Swiss-Prot record:
Keyword Zinc carried by entry: yes
Pathway linked to the protein: Metabolic intermediate biosynthesis; chorismate biosynthesis; chorismate from D-erythrose 4-phosphate and phosphoenolpyruvate: step 2/7
Positions of NAD(+) binding: G108, V109, I110, G111, D112, T132, T133, K145, K154
Coiled coil: none
Protein name: 3-dehydroquinate synthase
Naturally occurring in which organism (per UniProt): Cereibacter sphaeroides (strain ATCC 17025 / ATH 2.4.3) (Rhodobacter sphaeroides)
Matching Gene3D superfamilies: 3.40.50.1970, Dehydroquinate synthase-like - alpha domain
Membership in a protein family: Belongs to the sugar phosphate cyclases superfamily. Dehydroquinate synthase family.
Catalytic activity, reaction form: 7-phospho-2-dehydro-3-deoxy-D-arabino-heptonate = 3-dehydroquinate + phosphate
Length: 370
C-alpha cells in the first residue's frame, strides 16, 4: 500500500497529512527535513508509550535524531491545567528552543495538549502530530485547534496553532481496543453526514470491515482528512464553514461535561449520540426527511455504537441541566446557541435560530427512554 498525502492549504503555513502503513517505522526520515538540529521532544501518554514510543524513537535514532519523551497519564482528565503545566515546564527543562520541534505522539488528548503547549512555549514553536487513534487521525490532529478543558467546560482554553506535519500511520490502529476504534468511527461517520452522502453510503457497506481491512481503513481516513482539510482551508478560525465540523458536538460536549469527562462516555461516542440528536432535531423542525434520523441510527446500531442517551451508564442531569451545560459551548454567539443541523444526510448547515423549547423537548424525550 502506498502513502497518501493530503495537503492543508494555508499559504505559508500549509502542511501535509501523510496517511498509510509504516509511517512510525520511518518517522525519522519523514520528520528530519523539518529540523534545524537533530533533536526532538516528544509528549505522549503512558499507554501509547508502552505500545509505540520505543519503535518511534528507534526510527528517529536511525535518522540520527536524538529524542527525549514525557509520558503523561492516559485519559481525558489529563487534558487540564495540571498536566498542561507539567508538559510546558518539562519542555523548558529540556531546553526546547523556538526553532525546535515538539512531537505529539498519541490520541486527541495528547495532540490537543501538546499542540497548545507548543503554541505558548516561547510564543510558539513548531510541532508534528503523530496520531495513534482513529479519532485523532481523522479529526483532532488536522486543522490546528489545540487546547485544554477547564472546570467550566471542554476546550475553552486554547489556541489555533497549525502543525508542520501530520503522520497518520494506519497500522497502529490495529492495536486500538474495539471501543476506542468505534469511538473514532463516530468522527468518520460525521464527515459523511455533514457533506458527503456518497461517503456515508459507502460507509454503510464498508464500515464493518474497517478494523480488519487496511485498504478500506486508509480510504476512510483519507476521505475524512480531505473533507476536513478543504473546510479548514476555507475557514481556519471557525468564523463560518468550519463550524460544520461541530455537527453533533453541542450535545456531545454537554454530555461529556455531565459525565465528568470519564470513560462513561468517550468523545467519539458522544459525537455519534450528538449527531443522532441533531438529525432528530432537524427532522422535528421540518428540515430533513423523516427517514434520515432513522437511517443514521440504524447504521450506528449496526456498528454496535452508542446511539441514545439511554446507552450512557449512570445518572444524567435533567433537560434543563443539559441545556445549562450547552450554554458554555464555544459556538454560543451573543448568548445564543448555534446548532449544526441537516437538510438531509450529507447536507449540514449552521443554524442560529433553534427554538430552545424544542431542544428541551428533544432532550426530555431522550431522557424518558432511560
Amino acid at each position: 500500500m502506498t502513502v497518501d498525502a493530503v495537503r492543508v492549504e494555508l499559504g505559508a503555513r500549509a502542511y501535509e497529512v501523510r496517511i498509510g502503513p509504516g509511517l512510525i517505522a520511518r518517522a525519522g526520515a519523514e520528520i528530519a527535513p523539518l529540523l534545524r538540529r537533530p533533536k526532538l521532544a516528544i509528549l505522549t501518554d503512558e499507554t501509547v508509550a508502552g505500545l509505540h514510543l520505543a519503535p518511534f524513537q528507534a526510527a528517529l535514532a536511525e535518522a540520527g535524531i536524538a529524542s527525549s519523551a514525557l509520558a503523561l497519564p492516559a485519559g481525558e482528565a489529563t487534558k487540564g491545567w495540571e498536566q498542561f503545566s507539567r508538559a510546558v515546564e518539562w519542555l523548558l527543562e529540556e531546553k526546547v528552543e523556538r526553532r525546535d520541534v515538539v512531537v505529539a505522539l498519541g490520541g486527541g488528548v495528547i495532540g490537543d495538549l501538546a499542540g497548545f503547549a507548543a503554541a505558548v512555549l516561547r510564543r510558539g514553536v513548531r510541532f508534528v502530530q503523530v496520531p495513534t487513534t482513529l479519532l485523532a487521525q481523522v479529526d483532532s490532529s488536522v486543522g490546528g485547534k489545540t487546547g485544554i478543558n477547564t472546570a467550566q467546560g471542554k476546550n475553552l482554553v486554547g489556541a489555533f496553532h497549525q502543525p508542520s506535519l501530520v503522520l497518520a500511520d494506519i497500522g497502529v490502529l490495529e492495536s486500538l481496543p474495539a471501543r476506542d476504534f468505534l469511538a473514532g468511527y463516530g468522527e468518520v461517520v460525521k464527515y459523511g453526514l455533514l457533506g458527503d452522502a456518497d461517503f456515508f453510503e459507502w460507509l454503510e457497506g464498508a464500515a464493518p470491515r474497517l478494523a480488519s481491512d487496511p485498504e478500506a481503513r486508509q480510504r476512510a481516513v483519507r476521505r475524512s482528512v480531505e473533507m476536513k482539510a478543504e473546510i479548514v482551508a476555507r475557514d481556519e478560525t471557525e468564523e463560518g464553514d468550519r463550524a460544520l465540523l461541530n455537527l453533533g458536538h453541542t450535545f456531545c460536549h454537554a454530555l461529556e461535561k455531565a459525565t465528568g469527562y470519564s470513560d462513561r462516555l468517550l468523545h467519539g461516542e458522544g459525537v455519534a449520540i450528538g449527531c443522532a440528536l441533531a438529525f432528530e432535531l432537524s427532522q422535528h423542525m421540518g428540515l430533513c426527511p423523516q427517514e434520515a434520523p432513522s437511517r443514521l441510527r440504524a447504521h450506528l446500531r449496526a456498528m454496535g455504537m452508542k446511539v441514545d442517551l439511554r446507552d450512557i451508564p449512570g445518572d444524567l442531569p435533567d433537560a434543563e441541566g443539559l441545556l445549562r451545560l450547552m450554554a458554555q459551548d464555544k459556538k454560543v454567539v451573543d448568548g445564543k446557541l448555534r446548532f449544526i443541523l441537516a437538510r438531509d444526510i450529507g447536507a449540514a448547515f449552521v443554524a442560529k435560530d433553534v427554538p430552545g423549547d424544542l431542544v428541551r423537548r428533544i432532550l426530555q424525550e431522550a431522557l424518558a427512554t432511560r
